[in-house]
Curated annotation (Swiss-Prot):
One of its GO terms (molecular function) is hydroxybutyrate-dimer hydrolase activity. This is D-(-)-3-hydroxybutyrate oligomer hydrolase. It is found in: Secreted. InterPro entries: OHBut_olig_hydro_put. It comes from Burkholderia vietnamiensis (strain G4 / LMG 22486). Its main location: secreted. GO terms for biological process: butyrate metabolic process. HAMAP family: 3HBOH (MF_01906). Pathway: Lipid metabolism; butanoate metabolism. Keywords: Hydrolase, Secreted, Signal. Its EC number is 3.1.1.22. The active site is at residue 309. Participates in the degradation of poly-3-hydroxybutyrate (PHB). It works downstream of poly(3-hydroxybutyrate) depolymerase, hydrolyzing D(-)-3-hydroxybutyrate oligomers of various length (3HB-oligomers) into 3HB-monomers. It catalyses: (3R)-hydroxybutanoate dimer + H2O = 2 (R)-3-hydroxybutanoate + H(+).
Length: 696
């Protein structure tokens, strides 16, 4: 309690002291000034949105505008404004994490128009409120984690709440707006976003152009520490690289040389602390005529750490690292998390140990990148969804050639393509991939999700520079017909903040293998750049370039310190296998926390990693939206925190695929989505003493 300046005004001081103590007992304001956290770098941008022309959730587009397949237009495509870039970023990021088709559930089970009870009552769903935007940095000017707080007009300062929405993947700061931000805003909570220090930061090396915090562009030299990301190259190194490798791009997650995943938990905690500052700034009274006081202190606000994929992993890491009670509870979907497993931990299915669990992403992603193109050729996977812009004949040739090269290298067995493909698939099973995800192995590689992740994370885990061209890969613009590196007709940089996802290929910037002048990695060699894929794999298997140490640095201990928590994941996840992520985390948690644990786990059959793929033929008939259960989990946690309702126990949720004709599946109904049960019976998942047992 600050008594400075009271002087001899004893009576007034005593009265103020009494009021202060009463306020403190009720979590209210004190005479202390609200101080911007020390990690906030530069100024804070504050913008109010009226909920009509522009808003927090839809950027003025509403439910209808978000559903449009066409991105909002820029008045001048070469120089979009910050407001235009924000609108496109919200449009693209919202759509990236949910099924946007009406038959698939948009506008009926979720969407801006759907209230928290699942009813279509909110019209276009625009939400008025205020945004606070700033960087978090360590003083170097190179971290520059983007922090964003949205405070809806419906926020009740007497019943405060915060929901974190750490970006998924390597997305920009709006990267979890549909996954977690939307629920928080509808609940009347402040939403604390951050981009995890990856944040879709791009640099066009040839022009030395970078993005700023709002997506607008600047010369890297002039931007200085205001840049979202600038590669750590001298002017001489940059010129030499551009001479040898023109039309190339650097991306923050891959090329910051900081292993940003190490700080994802910290960034999430910082976003919560920044949200506290914003709420005090908005709702605390003035203490001296010009400065706001402190109404909320750490632990005063109900705070749910939420998000999906990488954002989910960040939320778990934050809860583990939390020493000041910033976080009350955790709700995450399909978390990408690297768990430090105890020797006695085990994952079982109906009593039988699975062949592999708890591997880090650096291991399973580089293995999948090597084997998936071959495994996809297996006749047992006939009818798998096709998710590539390449002609089918080209893709089939890639698969055959990858199998042949793997066989020649002694990495698969078999005298013909089918036997080689069967062996590749068997190796994936032995590495912990479930048969439930078999029909997605092709899609994960054909869509370039796995190659993109393997290259980006290998760069991050080795702290490689863009100039290193790790394993002979780079990011470049290419000729649409041939795949060869080429100058673009127009730079992709003006739109990269709005349309990019931070992991090339994205926004017109592709993943290339540096054969000759460089070619799209799928087309650079008949076996789709096998040599590069093998190199990435060997970085892990041979422990090269400090990769093991940097991976060890991102591992977590699965100790949530007694916080109530829910994890949701689809059993068919082929990007982040459930054996290595959620199941492994729950098993280790039962050691790390033991009887203190309040973690429950819901495994969704027929659920996979990318709900945005569900409208695609073959996805629509086979898979259900995991997002639906993420929302249910948030509602369950809210009731648990606010009314003491017990969380339903860990369980398998046995969903029903829509079926029908690929590309024309019948509309999703509640019959496809059974509720999370309070008494799961034979579907209960058991966890304890280092073991998790999941019923098949």
């Amino acid at each position: 309690m600050d008594t400075h300046g009271w002087g001899s005004r004893i009576l007034v001081g005593a009265a103020l002291a009494a009021l202060t103590m009463l306020g403190a007992c009720n979590g209210d304001e004190t005479a202390e000034r609200n101080q911007l956290p020390v990690f906030v770098s530069g100024s804070v941008r504050t913008t109010a949105y009226d909920g009509a022309s522009d808003d927090l959730l839809t950027a003025g587009l509403g439910k209808t505008g978000l559903a449009s397949a066409a991105a909002p237009a820029f008045a001048d495509p070469s120089r979009p404004t910050a407001a235009e870039l924000r609108r496109v970023a919200i449009w693209s990021n919202y759509r990236a994490l949910v099924d946007m088709s009406a038959n698939g559930g948009y506008g009926r089970f979720w969407g801006p128009n759907v209230d928290l009870d699942g009813n279509d009552t909110l019209g276009e769903g625009k939400i008025a409120g205020t945004e606070y935007l700033a960087y978090a940095d360590d003083g170097s000017g190179r971290k520059n984690v983007t922090l964003l707080v949205q405070v809806p007009a419906s926020f009740d300062p007497a019943q405060p709440c915060i929901v974190t929405a750490t970006s998924s993947g390597s997305r920009g700061v709006y990267g979890a707006i549909s996954a977690a931000g939307e629920w928080g805003l509808k609940r009347g909570c402040a939403v604390a976003y951050n981009d995890k220090g990856g944040g879709n930061g791009a640099q066009e090396l040839g022009s030395n152009t970078v993005t700023l915090i709002d997506g607008t562009l600047a010369n890297a030299v002039l931007a200085g520490s205001a840049s979202l990301f600038t590669a750590n190259l001298t002017s001489g190194d940059l010129a030499a690289f551009n001479s040898r490798f023109p039309n190339r791009y650097a991306f923050k997650h891959a090329h910051s040389q900081q292993n940003p995943e190490h700080d994802w938990g910290r960034a999430t905690l910082q976003s919560v602390e920044f949200a506290y500052w914003a709420l005090n700034q908005q709702f605390a009274p003035l203490v001296d005529g010009s400065h706001r006081g402190v109404r909320y202190r750490a632990g005063d606000i109900t705070t749910i750490a939420a998000s999906v994929s990488n954002g989910g992993g960040a939320a778990l890491a934050a809860a583990e690292q939390d020493t000041r009670r910033w976080i009350t509870a955790v709700v995450v979907g399909e978390p990408q998390i690297n768990v430090r497993m105890a020797p006695n931990a085990v994952v079982r299915e109906s009593g039988r140990p699975v062949p592999s669990f708890g591997r880090p992403l650096a291991d399973y992603a580089t293995l999948a990148n090597l084997l998936e193109p071959c495994a996809a050729a297996s006749a047992s996977l006939a009818g798998e969804p096709y998710l590539s812009a390449l002609p089918l004949a080209t893709t089939q040739s890639i698969r055959t050639q990858r199998c042949a090269t793997l066989a020649a290298a002694g990495l698969v067995s078999g005298a013909d393509t089918q036997s080689q493909a069967a062996d590749a698939l068997a190796q994936l099973h032995a590495a912990g991939y479930l048969a439930d995800s078999d029909l997605l192995q092709a899609s994960m590689w054909d869509s370039q999700a796995i190659p993109a992740i393997a290259v980006t994370y290998a760069n991050a885990y080795t702290r490689s520079s863009v100039a290193d061209n790790l394993c002979n890969f780079s990011f470049a613009t290419t000729n649409a017909a041939t795949g060869a590196v080429a100058a673009p007709a127009a730079s992709p940089m003006p739109a990269v903040f709005g349309l990019g996802n931070g992991v090339p290929p994205t926004a017109g910037i592709n993943l290339v293998f540096n054969t000759g002048a460089g070619v799209d990695h799928r087309l650079a060699t008949p076996d789709a750049s096998f040599a590069g894929a093998l190199c990435l794999r060997q970085l892990w298997t041979n422990g090269m370039l400090d990769m093991p140490a940097n991976v060890e640095a991102v591992r977590v201990n699965a100790n949530l310190q007694g916080k109530p928590a829910i994890i949701v994941q689809g059993r068919s996840d082929a990007l982040v296998p459930v054996n290595h992520a959620s199941r492994a985390y729950v098993a280790q948690n039962s050691i790390s926390e033991g009887g203190r644990s309040q973690l429950v786990f819901y495994e969704v059959t027929n659920g996979q990693h990318f709900d945005a793929f569900l409208p695609v033929a073959g996805f629509d008939t086979r898979f259900v939206p995991v997002h639906y259960y993420n929302v249910q989990a948030l509602n369950l946690m809210w009731r648990h925190l606010k009314s003491g309702a017990p969380l339903p126990p860990s369980q398998v949720i046995r969903t029903v695929p829509r079926g029908g004709t690929p590309g024309a599946a019948p509309a999703l109904t509640s019959a496809n989505l059974p509720p999370i049960s309070t008494a799961p019976g034979a579907n209960a998942i058991a966890a304890g003493a280092g073991a998790i047992d999941v019923p098949l």
